[in-house]
């Protein structure tokens, strides 16, 4: 059974420079850590939550270990300088799935996300495998049932697989099916897709679903496509699979990318999303601390989370 736990205060530690000036602060000094899951108390804040689950990665024959991602990313975030926007972060703990019940874990996350959004918060979720996206995305769809929701995925993989049960490779097919069941349009864009890592069947599925697809080779010149997608929806859910980055920047994932999209290009792509006023939910997924020997990959991932919170309007 999926359970909720508050984040350990030991994760939020860092260098104290406050003697220099009142605003010489780091995230560990400005993040609010909640001992209860109580989003109703934190309107207009950003709910930082962990989804400590990699059952979907295991089912997808990937490298397990992403369940340790949320706490590793908290540690990496803790010592980063606190700037505008970061004071809005409220750590609402981890959803932990100690059993293979992926479906139950996704439902728990879905309910939590919907509750946060309906309470007037926005959500920043640290995965976990990309199975995080179904629970997170479904919660967004639930919270904004009368509005068009755009799903923007930065990922080497389309994650539209067809299997007999949910995995880390199926979340966007699941979200498409959920939209079908709710008689609403499925607005999905995937940037950074590796043609070498997706079969023709997956490309055909993306075409049939009218997915906006931008390959890794073309992301250097994709801002117009991003802006066009932003303009056509009311609300946005942004999900970043860290395997969109090149292996030399992000080795600590289930399926490292031989080519990938460099971090600077990813940041340029997500900036207009964050500043659009439409972003309601974001996540970083697939970080696997077992393959991060010196913590450098955690800092790369944390920089993305740091930047999202800073730019979020």
From Swiss-Prot:
UniProt-listed GO biological process terms: L-histidine catabolic process to glutamate and formamide; L-histidine catabolic process to glutamate and formate; putrescine biosynthetic process from arginine, via agmatine
Coiled coil (UniProt feature): none
Cofactor(s) required, per the database record: Mn(2+)
The keyword Hydrolase appears for this protein: yes
Binding, Mn(2+) 1: 130, 155, 159, 241
Reaction(s) catalysed (UniProt annotation): N-formimidoyl-L-glutamate + H2O = formamide + L-glutamate
Cysteines engaged in disulfide bonds, as pairs: none
An example molecular function term from Gene Ontology annotations: manganese ion binding
Binding annotation for Mn(2+) 2: 155, 157, 241, 243
Enzyme nomenclature, EC number: 3.5.3.8
Superkingdom field: Bacteria
Cofactor note (record): Binds 2 manganese ions per subunit.
Pathway participation: Amino-acid degradation; L-histidine degradation into L-glutamate; L-glutamate from N-formimidoyl-L-glutamate (hydrolase route): step 1/1
Swiss-Prot/TrEMBL keywords: Histidine metabolism, Hydrolase, Manganese, Metal-binding
InterPro entries: HutG, Ureohydrolase, Ureohydrolase_dom_sf
Manganese in keyword set: yes
Family: Belongs to the arginase family.
Role summary: Catalyzes the conversion of N-formimidoyl-L-glutamate to L-glutamate and formamide.
Matching HAMAP family: Formimidoylglutam (MF_00737)
Name of the protein described by the UniProt record: Formimidoylglutamase
Organism of derivation: Salmonella newport (strain SL254)
């Amino acid at each position: 059974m999926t359970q909720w736990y508050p984040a350990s205060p030991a994760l939020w530690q860092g260098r104290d420079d406050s003697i220099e000036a009142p605003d010489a602060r780091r995230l560990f000094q400005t993040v609010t850590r909640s001992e209860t899951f109580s989003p109703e108390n934190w309107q207009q804040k950003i709910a930082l939550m962990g989804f400590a689950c990699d059952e979907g990665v295991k089912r997808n024959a990937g490298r397990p270990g992403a369940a340790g991602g949320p706490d590793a990313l908290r540690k990496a975030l803790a010592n980063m300088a606190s700037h505008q926007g970061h004071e809005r972060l409220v750590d609402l703990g981890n959803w932990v799935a100690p059993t293979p019940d992926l479906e139950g874990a996704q439902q728990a996350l879905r309910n939590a996300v919907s509750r946060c959004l309906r309470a007037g918060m926005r959500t920043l979720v640290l995965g976990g495998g990309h199975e995080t996206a179904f629970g997170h995305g479904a919660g967004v769809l639930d919270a904004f049932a009368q509005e068009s929701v755009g799903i923007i995925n930065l990922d080497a993989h389309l994650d539209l697989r067809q299997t007999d049960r949910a995995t880390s490779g199926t979340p966007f097919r699941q979200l498409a099916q959920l939209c079908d069941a709710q008689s609403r349009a499925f607005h999905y864009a995937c940037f950074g897709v590796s043609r070498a890592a997706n079969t023709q069947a997956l490309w055909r599925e993306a075409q049939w679903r009218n997915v906006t697809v931008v390959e890794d080779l073309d992301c250097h010149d994709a801002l117009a496509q991003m802006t066009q997608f932003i303009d056509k929806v009311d609300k946005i859910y942004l999900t970043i699979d860290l395997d969109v980055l090149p292996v030399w920047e992000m080795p600590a994932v289930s399926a490292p990318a031989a080519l990938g999209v460099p971090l600077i290009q990813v940041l340029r792509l997500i900036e207009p999303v964050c500043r659009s006023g439409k972003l309601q939910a974001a996540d970083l997924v697939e970080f696997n601390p077992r393959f991060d020997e010196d913590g450098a990959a955690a800092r790369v991932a944390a920089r993305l989370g740091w930047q999202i919170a800073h730019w979020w309007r």
